[in-house]
């Protein structure tokens, strides 16, 4: 159980290694990180047997930026036949589990294995239940089996309340046909990632106002409109007619980096292609001056030192708000629908409740 296994977007293995290594050093967990480029996974091999468990106990998964999913455990080799017996034998030393997820890597090889996993899950689930290794109890640890091939699997453990919301950290969101661009899924995923479902009515209500900076053609505006918000769309480019026809959108031809609302709004969202430092300044202005209560903003990443740059900008925001004596929660994640970017969620915690 001394290895921490993490899924990620292909090409971001180095960022996962840098991020987890920094946390491990801070927490005094000895070990080393490794990740093969484009493999869609990375691991932190701990020097001590309980190292991975310590890391997971002292970190909140939601605070990690680049890992999509994590689990502590080890690899085992499986025979061509009777894989279940070998797995049961290995699991005898582990706790009873409250749920089971079979996972594959987000790679071509992984996608080919997904059919095998679907077929294998039913008999495996039955065998685990019969052996008393799997019960229906959300408070118990989750068993995460990541198949590298039909013969090699990472047998992992994670707490259901401190790991990804979905298998492999990949949400099953359906692209709405009426949305003007696929980028709409980024904002929908952000709602799921950053706002507990039971708070949606309160924090994403139809009595709210929103601003979309760099809105054209309206992929993110669509999500705000879908929640029933009155939206001001800022962009010199055109907006989809279907959105304008709702009567909920006011389109202003202006620069998203200079325009400001006359009255504070509930939400500001922004997916402009710009250097991340400039976008960070925009965030600091909007949250710092109380122009919005909450914001979802994408930071486009540089080619090199991507984790270091994100960390620097997040630390800068935190220091800026602290210096102004403002209470702002800051979260950041590379979402499944993100590309060379990360998504930030910010919320003012010190404003009076809405009337």
From Swiss-Prot:
Binding site for S-adenosyl-L-methionine: 183, 216-219, 235, 255, 271
Function summary: Catalyzes the 2'-O-methylation at nucleotide C2498 in 23S rRNA.
InterPro entries: RlmM_FDX (IPR040739), RlmM_THUMP-like (IPR048646), RNA_MeTrfase_FtsJ_dom (IPR002877), rRNA_MeTrfase_M (IPR011224), SAM-dependent_MTases_sf (IPR029063)
Similarity-based family: Belongs to the class I-like SAM-binding methyltransferase superfamily. RNA methyltransferase RlmE family. RlmM subfamily.
Cell compartment(s), UniProt: Cytoplasm
Protein name: Ribosomal RNA large subunit methyltransferase M
Sample GO molecular function, one term: S-adenosylmethionine-dependent methyltransferase activity
Organism of derivation: Pseudomonas putida (strain W619)
SUPFAM superfamilies, alphabetized: S-adenosyl-L-methionine-dependent methyltransferases (SSF53335)
Quaternary structure (record): Monomer.
Keywords: Cytoplasm, Methyltransferase, rRNA processing, S-adenosyl-L-methionine, Transferase
Broadest EC class assigned to this enzyme: transferase
PANTHER family given in the database record: RIBOSOMAL RNA LARGE SUBUNIT METHYLTRANSFERASE M, RIBOSOMAL RNA METHYLTRANSFERASE FTSJ DOMAIN-CONTAINING PROTEIN
């Amino acid at each position: 159980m001394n290895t921490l296994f993490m899924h990620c977007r292909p090409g971001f293995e180095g960022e996962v290694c840098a991020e987890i290594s920094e946390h491990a050093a801070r927490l005094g967990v000895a070990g080393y990180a490794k990740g093969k480029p484009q493999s869609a996974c990375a691991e932190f091999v701990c020097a001590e047997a309980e190292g991975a468990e310590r890391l997971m106990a002292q970190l909140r998964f939601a605070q990690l930026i680049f890992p999509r999913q994590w689990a502590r455990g080890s690899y085992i080799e499986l025979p061509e036949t009777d894989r279940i017996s070998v797995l049961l034998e290995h699991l005898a030393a582990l706790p009873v589990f409250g749920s089971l997820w079979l996972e594959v890597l987000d790679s071509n090889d992984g996608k080919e294995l997904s059919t095998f996993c679907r077929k294998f899950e039913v008999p495996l689930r039955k065998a685990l239940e019969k052996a008393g290794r799997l019960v229906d109890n959300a408070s118990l640890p989750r068993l995460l089996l990541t198949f590298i091939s039909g013969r090699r699997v990472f047998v992992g453990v994670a707490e259901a309340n401190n790991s990804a919301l979905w298998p492999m950290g990949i949400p099953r969101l359906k692209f709405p046909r009426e949305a003007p661009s696929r980028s709409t899924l980024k904002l929908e995923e952000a709602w799921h990632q950053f706002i507990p479902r039971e708070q949606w009515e309160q924090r994403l209500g139809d009595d709210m106002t929103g601003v979309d900076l760099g809105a054209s053609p309206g992929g993110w505006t669509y999500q705000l409109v879908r929640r029933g918000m009155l939206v001001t769309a800022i962009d010199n480019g055109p907006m989809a007619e279907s959105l304008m026809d709702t009567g909920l959108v006011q389109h202003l031809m202006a620069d998203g980096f200079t325009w400001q609302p006359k009255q504070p709004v509930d939400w500001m969202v922004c997916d402009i292609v710009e250097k991340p430092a400039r976008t960070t300044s925009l965030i600091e202005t909007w949250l710092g001056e109380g122009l919005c209560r909450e914001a979802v903003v994408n930071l486009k990443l540089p080619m090199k030192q991507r984790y270091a740059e994100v960390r620097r900008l997040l630390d800068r925001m935190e220091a800026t708000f602290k210096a102004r004596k403002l209470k702002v929660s800051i979260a950041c994640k590379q979402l499944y629908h993100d590309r060379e970017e990360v998504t930030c969620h910010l919320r003012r915690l010190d404003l009076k409740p809405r009337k």
